[in-house]
Amino acid sequence: MTQVRETVSFKAGDVILYPGVPGPRDRAYRVLEGLVRLEAVDEEGNALTLRLVRPGGFFGEEALFGQERIYFAEAATDVRLEPLPENPDPELLKDLAQHLSQGLAEAYRRIERLATQRLKNRMAAALLELSETPLAHEEEGKVVLKATHDELAAAVGCVRETVTKVIGELAREGYIRSG
């Protein structure tokens, strides 16, 4: 007999989890479809994208260990999620541990990129990364990415106005088209 999994869905832009706020949705999730953005926001409202969670990935795992959350989890696209049980089985825990290990390696790479690379290089890397997510699609042989300048600023650790300037430079140099 096949076990039926509980799933929940959110529309693009919906906040799934809030920092430090326990509630009925304060659970760990596996992404089945779509893309979830994890963002930290400072007192001035500046956001930093900590991680993009793709299908098969997990987020909210601190709920399994009673830890406070420091980020918002937002549906970057329409998403379908599987809430994890409070007491996951060993196979699920193994998948979660592997995901956490990969997430830690990704975090190290992002920290290294933020600390050592010029903004234009960080922007190019972010655009390439986003081009491989559900935020992008192919149209007439070209990758079309749907992302705001605010979202790009959060991805590379700068303000929107700077993103606008760098996007303009990349467009003038012929690397991208913006519009």
Predicted feature locations:
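Long cytosolic regulatory regions associated with cyclic-nucleotide signaling
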Residues: 62, 77, 122-124, 162, ...
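Hydrophobic residues at beta-strand termini and immediately following loops
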Residues: 8-10, 50-53, 84
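A short hydrophobic beta-strand segment most commonly corresponding to one strand
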Residues: 77-86
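Phosphate-/nucleic-acid-contacting segments
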Residues: 132-179
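Short amphipathic alpha-helical elements of helix-turn-helix/winged-helix folds
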Residues: 126-130
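A small-molecule sensor/coupling module
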Residues: 86-124
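Short proline/glycine- and basic residue-enriched helix-capping loop/turn segments at helix->loop/beta transitions
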Residues: 1-14
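Cyclic nucleotide-binding regulatory domains
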Residues: 14-78
